[in-house]
C-alpha cells in the first residue's frame, strides 16, 4: 500500500514533462503541415508561372513561324535604318517627306525634261541670289530700312562623318559579297548577281543614271509604305511565289547544276 501511495504521489510530478513533450510533438506536426502547404502552394504557383510563360511564348512561336518577305524579322521602319531617313521614306513627317520628294521631282524635271546641266543651273541660281542680295543691301541705304540678315551657314562635322562611316560599311559589305560570289562557293548567288547586273545593263541602256536614281527614289517613297499597309497579303503571295521558285530551282539544280563540277573551295568547306 505504501508503494502504491508513493507511485501515485510521483506520477503527478511527471505530468508536466509529458505535457511539454506532447506540446513539442504537436508543434512539430503543425510546422511540418505548414511547410508542406507552403511547398505545395509554391509548386502550384511555379506551375502557374510556367503555364503563363508557355502560353505567352506560344504566340511568339506562332508569330516567328509566319513567313516574312526576304526573311525579315524586324519592322519595315527598322529595316530602313530607323531615325530620320526611315521617317521620311515612311511618310511619318509629311512636310519633310513632301519637301524631299518635291525637290527630287523638280531636279529631275530640270535636268531630264528641260535638259538643264547641273553646273549651268548652279551658276544661274548663284547669279540670281547674289544679284538680289546685293541690290537689296544697297537699296536699304536709300529707303532707310535695315539690310537683309544673311545667315552664316556651317556644315557640321558629325553628320558627314556618320554618312562616310555608313557608306564605308556598305561598300565593304558589297565588296565582300562580290568576292564570295566570284570564289565559286554559291552558284545561286552567282546566278542572282549575273541576272541583276544584266537587268541593270538593260535599264542603263534605256534610261539615264539620273532617271534611274529618281525611279529608285520613287520606289523608296512608295513600296515600303504600301508593304507596311498590306503586309500580311504581300507576305502570303510572296510565300507562294518563293515556294514555286524553290521548286523550279530544285528541278534546274537536279538537271543542270548538279552536273557542273565544283571548285576546290567548296570541297574544303565541306571538309
Swiss-Prot record:
Subcellular location: Endoplasmic reticulum membrane
Keyword Repeat: no
Transmembrane segments: 95-115, 116-136, 206-226
Residue ranges of domain Reticulon in the record: 85-271
Membrane topology summary: Multi-pass membrane protein
GO biological process assignments: endoplasmic reticulum tubular network organization; response to bacterium
Recorded GO CC terms: cytoplasmic side of endoplasmic reticulum membrane; endoplasmic reticulum; endoplasmic reticulum membrane; endoplasmic reticulum tubular network; Golgi apparatus; plasma membrane
Annotated positions of the N-acetylalanine modification: 2
Biased composition (Basic and acidic residues): 1-10, 20-39
Region of interest (Disordered), residue spans: 1-60
Pfam families per record: Reticulon
InterPro entries, per the entry: Reticulon (IPR003388), Reticulon-like (IPR045064)
GO molecular function, one term: mRNA binding
Keyword tags: Acetylation, Endoplasmic reticulum, Membrane, Transmembrane, Transmembrane helix
Main location: endoplasmic reticulum
PROSITE patterns associated with the record: RETICULON
Description of how the protein assembles with itself and partners: Interacts with VirB2.
Function: Plays a role in the Agrobacterium-mediated plant transformation via its interaction with VirB2, the major component of the T-pilus.
Protein name as annotated: Reticulon-like protein B2
Gene: RTNLB2
